[in-house]
Amino acid sequence: MIPGEIQVAAGDIELNVGRETVSVNVANHGDRPVQVGSHYHFYEVNDALVFDREPSRGFRLDIPAGTAVRFEPGQARTVQLVAYAGKREVYGFQGKVMGALEGKA
């Protein structure tokens, strides 16, 4: 092994297998680019991103950890979201949830 070398198993790694997903059409109505990270609660993204937010409650982008999606001004696209797992509690971001996702609206 070479120092710093990373050895990975052969084959592809499937992400988020069996988790609930939803597709959302999103448009950036702002005058600046908006970048959203892989684990950001999509329901609470920048208000310049216009979309039906309710279906995104409890979901994040279905992309590899540590990556992001950038929305340029005036750009519209469809993104795939995946449900949060574990305790399904959300804290921080814009403070719109601050607790359990289930049983609150």
Curated annotation (Swiss-Prot):
Instruction: Give the UniProt keywords, A-Z.
Output: Cytoplasm, Hydrolase
The pathway this protein participates in, as annotated, is: Nitrogen metabolism; urea degradation; CO(2) and NH(3) from urea (urease route): step 1/1
The UniProt catalytic activity note for this protein reads: urea + 2 H2O + H(+) = hydrogencarbonate + 2 NH4(+)
* EC numbers on record: 3.5.1.5
GO cellular component terms?
urease complex
The record's listing under NCBIfam families reads:
PRK13203.1 (NF009682), urease_beta (TIGR00192)
Which family is this protein grouped under? Belongs to the urease beta subunit family.
> What quaternary structure, including any partners, is listed in this protein's UniProt entry?
Heterotrimer of UreA (gamma), UreB (beta) and UreC (alpha) subunits. Three heterotrimers associate to form the active enzyme.
Task: Please give the name of this protein.
Answer: Urease subunit beta
Q: What is the lineage of its organism?
A: Bacteria, Pseudomonadati, Pseudomonadota, Gammaproteobacteria, Pseudomonadales
